[in-house]
Amino acid sequence: TDGHGEVNITQAMAMSCDVFFYKTIQQIDIDKLHTIFRKFGFGSKTNVDIPNESKGLIPNKEYLMKRYGKYGWSRGTLLNLAIGQGEILVTPIQVLNYINLIATKGNSPSCHFVMVDNLPSNSKPELEDNHWEQVYKGLRSAIISKKGTGRKSDPAIDGFKVYGKTGTAE
């Protein structure tokens, strides 16, 4: 195939263009990436109402150096992190919280299985409105664009918009 060609963030999200994210992550410090993941609730417990909840794993430089040694982790390790694979471990409830944070621009209570008043809030990632809009545009394009990886998921119901992102579990 000819590949995706040159794409912007919206197209990269819609077409699930790994190369775009490989190039992007090489411009971000691993510890900065770790901080961003943590702001969205990954790498820490959600305190959902189930025993023995795992916090998952979002690797930082310290973790990678301890695991692989000073020069042991490769660019490939970093590239895998860009697409949510490799050393990343997340729980289904963390993914649910993440989607809720995106859907509400960070104004989402944390998820619980038991109904209670005054639910604690998720961490609120501070993003500029144009960043939220880029995310929404990419998630919508994954469903409605001709090259979107989720294009067959649109129910085409008036007044009902589906947003989504396909992915590959490791």
Model-derived features: positions:
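Beta-lactam-recognizing serine transpeptidase/beta-lactamase-like catalytic domain environment
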Residues: 1-170
